[in-house]
């Protein structure tokens, strides 16, 4: 599914994802600051990283998103590209790789995860987020009658993968990740809106 972007403003989910992103990068000593945003959308996260001193490249399948990014953020490099492409061969590897709220849209999450991990330089980190699912949250959705609105069955091209901590951890480890730390964000942990995996190489 390809989003159509009408502006370069931060998304709703950026409001609860960016604090973890900033905490992670600010608590780290960087000898080099090259960053890659896999699924950069309208470039808002690329711009945030640029404002924190990173040399940023991003790719997205959305033409409108990339056009918004190029028009609004000339100091970052945003281009058309897919998580199924051999991006490391084309762009190289990076000290920081970010992918926020993208993998849940992918028919081939293993291929996407392998691309994500391939972009992380030795000694670098990757930060990947996706909506959180777990027993208590799913039960709460069912009991409050919000399953339909949450799973967005009528959203053309919407979310097609629904990860728990266990399934996302399994996916990343199958694809070669070893050192993974999780954060749950947006609400109290059992009802979290999203989870953020921080992968160290």
Where are these regions (language model features)?
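Conserved N-terminal segment of class I S-adenosyl-L-methionine
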Residues: 1-92, 96, 100, 109-113, ...
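Feature marks short, surface-exposed loop/turn motifs that line or immediately flank catalytic pockets
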Residues: 123, 134-136
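A short glycine-rich, Lys/Arg-flanked "PGG" loop and its adjoining helix->strand segment in the class I
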Residues: 113-122
